[in-house]
Amino acid sequence: EVNFPMNENLEIEYKMLVSEQEFNQLRDLTGVDQVLVQSNVYYDCTPSSTLKHIAMRIRDVQGKHWFTMKIPQAEGVREMEMELPENSPEALDNPEIRALFDELGLTLPVHVCGQMITHRHLRVYPLGELCLDHSLINGRSDYEIEFEITGDPQAGKAFFLDLLNQAGLTYRENKRSKYARCVLDQ
């Protein structure tokens, strides 16, 4: 059996739902370093992890399968992530994920509760990663801009707001995650 260690980080990001026109404005202004096609399968358990505002998925990108669990914190989101050998409910039944489930009071097994495909236009900056996401969620197009801060949080936010300003956009906080739009808004 292959051992895939779990990574933990505190995700601080700014997200905004946009129209297709706004998406194109920012993409044309910033350019992109690469475009990734991501297949996301969202999972839940009984009782539901959404009652604790926890989201979990396995994302297939570039031939790899990444398990991610997002747990809200006072500031940011605790993100637990590890590579898996496959995208299936059975792949989640391993010691590290069972320990995480125990810590959070969740139980296996899990079941699929939603799926989506995202075309991520990625641009890396010194203060963070700009992700321009066009997703197909339950048969409809969804456009979202994310700036995931990798440096100083205040400088990263200022940089992102300046990018939006250059594109003629004003920041509108997005309170609905992709998980919520895919799973809860069906």
Question: Which role fits each region the language model picked out?
Answer:
Residues 3-126, 178-186:
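N-terminal strand-loop-strand beta-hairpin
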Residues 24, 132, 155-156:
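Short helix/loop capping segments that flank catalytic or ligand/cofactor-binding pockets
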Residues 58-62, 134-136, 149:
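Short, low-complexity Ser/Thr-rich regulatory SLiMs
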Residues 123-135:
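Short amphipathic beta-strand starts and helix->beta connectors
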Residues 150-186:
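Acidic/polar low-complexity flexible segments
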